[in-house]
Structures are given as structure tokens and as C-alpha cells.
Design a protein with these regions (language model features):
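Conserved two-metal-ion catalytic palm core of "right-hand" nucleic acid polymerases
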Residues: 1-203
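Active-site palm subdomain of RNA-directed nucleic acid polymerases
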Residues: 200-239
Length: 239
């Protein structure tokens, strides 16, 4: 239950909030898994997100979200129980620079392999050493545009997921259900802020990276890496 404990105690609030907002006491939930009443782990109850916009560069704003603690605990428990399967799917891409890493200490429970845009500088330099151009693309409203029903598509393929859409033996269906329950049943978008969303989004984006890699030779273009973060996904292709 270590991942459940860490996601609750150090991955609940958005990182933009000051340190005075602390959820370290929520780690106790991980020790109460078996003692908690069945209603706590309900798979049918829904809750609403608490949302707040913070300014970004220019005129843009980032819509942060704080989920109901019970709904978030359900999602984190699913990630914890199924981490081996999630990790196996994430590892399919050899070019992603955003693979989520769990940390036992520090301010956050989960960080991407390259946590900050500034840390991409050496990677860009390496890409330039073998080519002339870096192609960069920005995915607008990335988290907000993820369709929760597409989470099982990414994990199990769209064909399988549609054939077994009510089969909760599939991890993707359980994650989809937890995400919807956490945001009043809505299927469009996942909350920006909690560390669990980083795990879900990277798992979802993994198929895109694999598809790019499979088609990475188009004429003189060779894809060397994909490094998405919240709201931006630069793709590096030396020509």
C-alpha cells in the first residue's frame, strides 16, 4: 500500500499550492484499507471536483482541481493494486521522457522522468547533435481533452474495450469508473493537479509514443523522443 499512502499524503493537492496546505495525515487511510466500511470504497457514489484557476504566462489560465478525498482514495487504491500492469504498459515506449517515477521522499509522490521544462535543455542539445531541426508541438488542454472511456482503449485496445465495456475485470474500465466517479460522472477530461492524473495521462499517452516510434522513419525524419507535461508535449525529431 506504499503507493496509495504516497499518492494520498504527497500527491493530493496541486503542486501550485503553498506548503501550508498539507495532506500528510491522509497516509493513515492506507493503513485502514481493510477496516474502512464498504461504503468508503463504493464504486457507484460520485462527487464533484473543487476547481480553481491559476494564471499562466500571457493570458492563459490553468484550471486546477481538488477531488473529493474518498473518490481520490478509490482511484489511488486502484493504481496501487494494479501498478504492475500499469508499469508494464508504460514501459512499452522506449522514447518517452515523462515516465512517472514514484519517490519515497520529497514534496511530490510522483514526478515525470524529466520534471521541468528547463531540464529538457540537455535533451534538446543531444537531439541537435544528430540533426538540424527540432520539431515541437503543443497539445492544447491536454488533460481536459482526455476522454475517460479512452483509458481502457489505451490499455486494452479500442476493440477489446468496446467488446467488454462493462467488464470490470479490465483495469482500464476500473480506472475509467474511478475517474468518472471523482468528477460527478463526467467523461471528458481528468483533473489537473493530483499526482494520480500524471500516472493516468502518461499511461494514456503511451500508445501515441509507441505509434510515433513505429512510424519514426518518414523520409529523412527520425523521432528521438517525446516529452509531454501538463499542457505541452514537445516532440523532438532531428532532420
Amino acid at each position: 500500500m506504499r503507493k496509495l499512502r504516497d499518492l494520498l499524503s504527497r500527491g493530493y493537492f496541486p503542486r501550485e499550492l503553498p506548503p501550508v496546505y498539507d495532506t500528510s495525515s491522509m497516509r493513515r487511510v492506507a493503513t485502514m484499507v481493510n477496516a474502512a466500511p464498504a461504503s468508503f470504497w463504493s464504486t457507484t457514489r460520485t462527487s464533484e471536483l473543487c476547481q480553481h484557476n491559476v494564471p499562466r504566462s500571457g493570458t492563459l489560465r490553468r484550471p486546477l482541481a481538488i477531488p473529493n478525498p474518498v473518490g481520490y482514495a478509490n482511484l489511488c487504491r486502484e493504481i496501487d493494486n494494479s501498478w504492475r500492469e500499469i508499469s508494464r504498459h508504460i514501459s512499452k515506449s522506449a522514447i518517452s521522457k515523462s515516465t512517472p517515477q514514484f519517490y519515497t521522499a520529497g514534496a511530490r509522490a510522483v514526478l515525470p522522468e524529466i520534471p521541468n521544462q528547463a531540464d529538457l535543455v540537455p535533451f534538446r542539445a543531444l537531439a541537435r547533435s544528430s540533426g538540424k531541426t527540432i520539431l515541437s508541438t503543443d497539445i492544447s488542454r491536454f488533460y481536459g481533452s482526455i476522454y475517460t472511456h479512452s483509458v481502457p482503449w489505451a490499455l486494452h485496445t479500442k476493440v477489446v474495450a468496446k467488446q467488454r465495456r462493462r467488464d470490470y475485470g479490465l483495469l482500464g474500465n476500473r480506472l475509467d469508473r474511478s475517474l468518472r466517479n471523482m468528477q460527478d460522472g463526467q467523461t471528458m477530461g481528468i483533473p489537473i493537479g493530483p499526482d494520480a492524473s500524471l500516472v493516468i495521462s502518461d499511461d494514456w499517452l503511451r500508445n501515441l509514443g509507441v505509434s510515433f516510434y513505429d512510424d519514426s522513419m518518414v523520409g529523412p525524419v527520425k523521432l528521438t523522443g517525446i516529452a509531454p507535461s501538463i499542457g505541452v508535449a514537445p516532440i523532438f525529431s532531428p532532420l
